[in-house]
A protein has these predicted regions:
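CBM-like carbohydrate-recognition segments
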Residues: 26, 47-86, 98-108, 114-138, ...
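Extended ligand-binding groove/face enriched in aromatic
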Residues: 106-109, 115-250, 254, 366, ...
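Inter-helical turn/loop segments and adjacent helix faces that build the functional surface
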Residues: 99, 200-215, 274-286, 338-346
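Alpha-solenoid repeat junctions
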Residues: 89, 96, 145, 201, ...
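Short, contiguous, pocket-lining structural segments
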Residues: 185-192, 209, 213-216, 252-267, ...
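Oxyanion-binding "anion nests"
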Residues: 266-315
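Alpha-helical scaffold segments in carbohydrate-active enzymes
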Residues: 62, 91-94, 114, 159, ...
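Extracellular parallel beta-helix/beta-solenoid repeat domains
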Residues: 1-48
């Protein structure tokens, strides 16, 4: 076509092209007025006029279309109290703050309206489970409460904060992940519990007493770093068993076998959020900043050079390993926000932009209904539970979840998992608000 001249009014209708590779396009000016209708390239619909200017809005409204009721996000079949739903709704709320679309705010309000009774009772929440996952949505509630100060929300938050005050701990003082995971510290749990714990302390205990809670949060982060860090790889293991007796734990270190990318994503996002909540003059902020910098430096080293993305298991090179969307979205967000807040230098911003654009090119799919999807999301990965009376009897043991590479590869991959959608929206907001260049689809 380089020699073609005056080709115009081209209509490409009902065509599908697979295996198309990125390459430089030479603009000659000899052809123009090209129109697309129902054109699909590499499984993604090509749109001349996207319905939203910003990916944060586009993904938010895509999810709202897929789940018209917010309590049915993340493939829920009935209303449920879920950290995943909270992890989606919070960046949606931030999208409302950025672009003032009232339909988004109303969507966010609908979740506590449905899930929290007037007396503060939370549907599906069991205090006695001491499940850190069930505390995460408190962080969404405390942010929503600033815009929607309902008494029921306040009562629900107080219940969650009470759980954290009484959460069982390791001998060193770090929260157990759940009662069924007694004596275990998971990187996931740092995100589920500590940001809300840190942010809510001055609200419920007063500013003077809050320092004790802030010190506690920083202590837990530093102790988690110590127990999960692997100097041999320069990465952090998914979890640590204080007893060294769980079937998945190394009997010498208590650590699980591998560095799972999403666990690292939870951990790094937690540190950013704890820093958001700590006062600027709080003496121990630097400890958290230093640990955050240490983690991000390690993650940039294992960023895929070609795509800017990360593999599901960070410490294994194997053809079965795959580039994974939830963790890549988390790391992009942390790199970009860390740069904006001055924790990271410009090299990390560049790594964040590369990661984000890698997500757009490799994981974002435009659907025929003009929604977008985040593909290649690991649905779930965990460890055990192992035999742990009285919490886990023999018939409840799950030996399949042994922390091996083969185990991680066995878990399902799906589109639009909320654990990736939420961080993708956050990363999009960072790109948009910093005016950084976004790749075209």
């Amino acid at each position: 076509l380089d020699d073609a001249d005056e080709i115009y009014n081209i209509h490409v209708d009902n065509c599908t092209f697979d295996g198309v590779q990125d390459q430089a396009v030479k603009r000659t000016g000899k052809s123009h007025d090209i129109f697309f209708n129902n054109l699909v390239v590499n499984g993604s619909t090509v749109l001349l006029d996207p319905p939203y200017k910003h990916y944060s809005e586009w993904m938010t409204h895509s999810e709202m279309k897929r789940a018209p009721q917010s309590y049915l996000l993340d493939f829920a079949k009935k209303p449920r109290w879920s950290y995943t739903i909270g992890t989606e709704l919070e960046p949606m709320l931030d999208t409302y703050r950025a672009y003032k679309d009232e339909s988004i705010l109303n969507y966010c309000k609908a979740y506590p309206d449905k899930m929290i009774a007037a007396d503060g009772t939370i549907t599906g929440y069991k205090y006695e489970d001491f499940n850190l996952d069930n505390c995460r949505t408190g962080h969404f509630l405390i942010n929503l409460y600033q815009l929607y100060p309902q008494p029921s929300i306040l009562k629900g938050m107080k219940t969650i904060f009470k759980q954290l005050e009484n959460q069982p701990r390791t001998k060193e003082g770090v929260f157990w992940h759940k009662a069924i995971y007694a004596n275990q510290v998971w990187l996931d749990g740092i995100f589920m519990g500590l940001p809300f714990y840190t942010k809510a302390a001055p609200e419920f205990k007063g500013y003077k007493k809050a320092k004790k809670y802030w010190d506690d949060a920083v202590d837990q982060i530093t102790k988690t770093d110590k127990r999960t860090y692997d100097p041999a790889t320069g990465l952090w293991k998914h979890a640590w068993d204080e007893t060294h007796k769980q079937f998945w734990a190394n009997p010498e270190t208590g650590q699980s076998q591998h560095s799972w990318a999403r666990a690292m994503g939870w951990y790094t996002m937690a540190m950013v959020e704890v820093l958001d909540a700590l006062p600027s003059n709080y003496a121990r902020r630097a400890e958290v900043v230093n640990l955050f910098q240490k983690a991000m430096a390690a993650l940039v080293k294992c960023q895929d050079k070609k795509t800017g993305l990360w593999y599901d298991v960070l410490d294994v090179k194997d053809p079965k390993n795959y580039l994974e969307a939830t963790a890549s979205s988390m790391f992009a967000y942390c790199l970009l926000k860390g740069y904006r807040l001055g924790y990271l230098d410009a090299n990390y911003k560049d790594a964040g932009v590369k990661a984000y654009n890698g997500i757009i090119k490799n994981f974002i799919k435009v659907n025929p209904d003009k929604t977008i999807s985040l593909t290649h999301c690991c649905e779930v990965s965990g460890l055990g539970p192992g035999y742990n009376p009285p919490y886990v009897p023999e018939n409840k043991v799950n030996k399949r979840r042994d922390g091996s590479f083969e185990y991680y590869m066995s878990e399902p991959i799906r589109d639009n998992d909320g654990k990736g959608v939420g961080p993708f929206i956050w990363a999009s907001l960072e790109m948009e608000q910093q005016g950084l260049p976004v790749a075209s689809k």
